[in-house]
Each structure stands twice: as structure tokens, then as C-alpha cells.
Amino acid sequence: MFSMLKMLAIAAIAGLGGLCTQAVESEDLPDETNRTFEQTEGELGLNIFGFSLHTDRSAGYNEVNPGIGLRYAFCNPAPRWTLFGDASIYYDSNRQWAKYVALGTSYRFATSWMVGAAVAYGQSRSYNHGKPFFALVPGIGFEYRRLVFNAVLLPSETADSKIVGLAVFMTIPLGHGQ
């Protein structure tokens, strides 16, 4: 039952995300409905990990995955595109500490929504017999008041299953590195 509640909560957040792009009328908050929040060159962000959901619900995976990392926007090679790098550590679904660095790109397809992918180089005792590995990690992000809520597909380490699950984390902007 608890697993179903988590899935419903995530679906509700994603569904209500479209409502968050509506204009907010308030004396305290400026109207930013026409503003695009593209991550600008040199911007640094703090990744706060999270949660995960898995396709095999009976496997007993750990779905509370605390962790921390940094995201850096290298450049904006074209309008709506950002080239970024990540370096993070988190407690993975198999109850081991996982580390990764990644290079990726994202495309902002709507005011608050972006889609992207990264090539990650990671290491955890849980995967690939503890040896470092490369993985292609696709994802989607929703930005609200400069906070970015990210969801990425967790790739499988075997050819039997293409997707293991979905991980959710947040990126908090720290300002410009320049």
C-alpha cells in the first residue's frame, strides 16, 4: 500500500506541475511568467538526493537514497540548450555508497520543463562487481522558483532488463561560479 501511495504522489506532483506555470498574483512575488530560467554559463547547483522507485517492487530495494553533489553549467551552446557536469555521492538502492561523475546536456522545451541525458562514470560495490562503469542516463526536470526537480531513469547492468527504476532528486542553484 505504501508503495502505491508513493507512486500516486509522484504522479500527482508531475500532473500538477503544469499548474505551477500559471501566473501567481501577489504583492510579495514578482510576475515571472515570461521569464525563462535557463541555467547560465558558470552557474553552480547543489544536488540533493532523494528517492527511487523500482520496476521490481518485490526485490526489496532501498528507495530512500540520501546524497549530495554538485552540478555545474559549462555553457549554453544554443538557445534552450545547456551543457552541464555532475559529481555526486549517494546511498544507492542496494544499500551501498555510489559515486559518479557525468557530462550531459539538457533542452528546455517549455517554460518550466526540460529533458536531457548524461553519460555517467560511476562506481558502487552494488553494481558491476564493484568496478567502475559507464551508463547513459536520460531524465526530465521541472523548475519551480529556481529549484529543479529531476527524475532520471535508472539503467540496468544486465541485458535482461532495460530500466531498473526511476530516481528523483533536486538541484538548488548556488549562483554563478564566475
Language-model-detected regions and their locations in the chain:
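Short loop/turn motifs that connect adjacent beta-strands in outer-membrane beta-barrel proteins
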Residues: E25, T33-G42, C75-T82, R108-V115, ...
